[in-house]
Amino acid sequence: MTSTQSPLIILDRDGVINHDSDRYIKSPDEWLPIEGSLEAIARLTHAGWSVAVATNQSGIERGLFDINVLHAIHNKMMNAVAEKGGRIDGVFFCPHTANTACSCRKPSPGLLKILAADSAGRSTRRPSWATPCVTSRREQLLNAISGLLRRGRA
């Protein structure tokens, strides 16, 4: 692997990095990290992984918050990760509800295709291979990192 290549892990946001809510995360104040998630991302960063977030954010289409609020939430998340020594290389989101016929809402592959196209266009940190770990369970994230550690990849 050259210095311009790194493995990529793709994480969901709500329920993996931060606590989820049936009422949606509608402001930066409502975004609360799950214990250990920021440190796990920092550990992946230090091991040379690129970390991306792929998240459904139907609250936009529902009118619960706008794109500026979503960016503020993501800035808070990225700053919190940075404070622990980690980095999120990109955040990709679908703003649609499940009733909208779109290809970007997970589990449809559109969001991952957008992410892949973006990653392929980067000249400084081009992933050499991808490990889609788009999940909504903290335990799955921790198990994935544990497995990577056992294989010497994190």
Where are these regions (language model features)?
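Short acidic capping loops at alpha-helix termini that bridge into adjacent secondary structure
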Residues: 88-90, 123-126
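Acidic, Mg2+-coordinating phosphoryl-transfer loop and its flanking beta/alpha structural elements
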Residues: 128-154
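Substrate-recognition element of Asp-dependent hydrolases with the DxDx(T/V) motif
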Residues: 37, 41-74, 87-100
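Short, electropositive alpha-helical surface patch
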Residues: 63-78, 102-117
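Active-site neighborhood of HAD-like aspartate-dependent phosphohydrolases
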Residues: 2-52
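Glycine-rich phosphate-binding loop signature in dinucleotide/nucleotide-binding domains
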Residues: 2-4, 115-125
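Short helix-capping segments at alpha-helix termini
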Residues: 81-87, 120
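Anion (oxyanion) recognition and catalysis
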Residues: 42-46, 82, 140
